[in-house]
Amino acid sequence: MLIPSNRTKRECILSRLCFLVLSVWVSLPSAAQNNPYKIDDALYPIYQRASKQARQQEGLLVADTLYQQALKLGDKKAQCLAYIIPLQFYISQKDDSKIEKASTDLKEISRANNYLQYYYHAWSSEIIYFLNQQRSLLALQKAEKMKKQAFADRYPYGIFSCIRTMGHIYKSRGNFDLSAQYYQEALDYMLKNMPDQDPSQLYSSLAEYYRNTQKDYATALDYCEKALKSAKTERNIAQAMIEKCLVLFRQGRIDEFNDCYKEAVQMADRCKLSASVSLLIAHISKNILDKQYEQAHAHADQLSEKGLQQHAYIYECAKDYPNAIKYLKKYHQQLDSTNNLLQLSDIAELNTQIGAERLKMENIQA
């Protein structure tokens, strides 16, 4: 059972009703697998519903039904997918202890059923959660454990996930050079060992690095073109197109930028990428070209970490140099504050771990 054993009576009734309703879909055995996840077609609608409700308590009930029906049909992959839902739910609730349990449960069934991609999905989900919580030291430590296991398994997807995750971690810590090294290593590993996978996101990440950090726009544009050629989904094509817009803007190729921007915005709307940081910066670039500085500032307000930097750039383009200097100073103060908080977070995490280890030793000696 995927839902906690201490459920309320109401939850038990809901679970039974959910089971009865959804069982209609899987009343007849089916071996067809004409869906993206290659699970039994009778189970796929249940998974879709569970996935859509993954942030709600009801999602746990649907996941429980999915698991029970997957057991009946002997679909081991669907059983693993059912265990992903509780992990997603508890991550949305920011419940560390239940996240740990849900992750462990997913790892165990994935290994038992020989679907190791979901074993490493559990690791990656935990790591990204801790990164979003500004607990990058813990994320880094978990990534190291994940790496050891991936190499022990000799599992290409696991090894690739570890390398890419290290890139995410160092990017979140502001070490963009080391992050890019890991992204390049992950890309090389994917192209060699997983040629059927989509490398476009890594190409786009490297394009961003060369655009932002190295100011090497020719190399950045080359990575954008590779991303566009290799992308297998419209969403990844849109992300690569947005990055290409930003490079063209920096190169001063305005006519090409305008054409690229128009196409990128249309694709982003279809893929619901409105909150994308890169897209917001592309909007700001277009506003600056059209001298729509108020709209540019409104877009910059939607950015968290890069907002102050963009405000400074907009004021500079508008030739309002006093405000440009003012916001640039604020941006650098924000960077210093973020770095200090990161160090304090690392120290707090270390102290917690040392305290836990000391308590273990005291219990052993007692």
Spans of features found by a protein language model:
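Hydrophobic positions within repeat-based interaction scaffolds
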Residues: Y37-Y44, D301-A366
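"A position-specific structural signal for the A-helix of alpha-solenoid helical repeats
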Residues: P45, I85, S125, G158, ...
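N-terminal leader/linker segments that initiate helical-solenoid repeat arrays
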Residues: S30-I84
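Structural motif corresponding to the intra-repeat A-B loop/turn of tetratricopeptide repeats
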Residues: Q53, L73, Q93, N113, ...
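Residue register of alpha-helical TPR repeats
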Residues: D41, L81, H121-A122, S161, ...
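Residue-level recognition of tetratricopeptide repeat
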Residues: Q48, Q88, I128, H168, ...
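Amphipathic alpha-helical segments of tetratricopeptide repeats
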Residues: D64-Q68, T104-R111, E144-F151, E185-L191, ...
